[in-house]
């Protein structure tokens, strides 16, 4: 069993975040003794899932719904599946967007590296895509 401070340190989260998750009902089996929250391995696993889902872009209300579905057993598999399909699609779209951003940044790095080597932008400005390295086009 772990105190809220220990869990906060383990997950590098503010204590206030753990209190908020508790208030939102994300730790339904959390034990309290003399006003102290005691986190078991079950809560630690729930927290791992919560943090993963947050990083994937799920809002707390959706995470809460997912956690409730998990307690309801196999009958909620279709809902859980749909939740993850939607989130997968959203994450894949974000990855595509970030890839385009990274491509532009790589191009600008290449562009200014060449401009610095030449002492100006004149040559690099007039290059056609066919004259650029494959990874920059």
Give, region by region, the residue ranges found by the protein language model.
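Helix-centric, low-specificity signal for extended rod-like, repetitive segments
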Residues: 12, 41, 47, 73, ...
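C-terminal regulatory/oligomerization modules of transcriptional regulators
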Residues: 75-137
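Basic helix-turn-helix/winged-helix DNA-binding cores
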Residues: 1-68
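A generic structural signal for solvent-exposed, polar alpha-helical segments
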Residues: 8, 26-27, 44-45, 72-75, ...
């Amino acid at each position: 069993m772990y105190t809220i401070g220990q869990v906060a340190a383990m997950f590098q989260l503010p204590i206030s975040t753990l209190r908020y998750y508790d208030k939102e009902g994300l730790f339904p089996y959390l034990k309290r003794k003399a006003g102290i929250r005691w986190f078991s391995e079950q809560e630690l696993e729930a927290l791992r899932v919560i943090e993963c889902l947050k990083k994937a872009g799920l809002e707390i209300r959706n995470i809460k719904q997912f956690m409730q579905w998990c307690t309801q057993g196999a009958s909620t598999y279709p809902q859980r599946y749909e939740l993850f399909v939607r989130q997968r699609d959203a994450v894949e779209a974000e990855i595509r967007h970030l890839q385009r951003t990274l491509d532009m940044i790589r191009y600008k790095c290449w562009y200014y590296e060449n401009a610095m080597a030449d002492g100006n932008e004149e040559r690099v400005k007039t290059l056609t895509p066919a004259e650029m390295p494959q990874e920059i086009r």
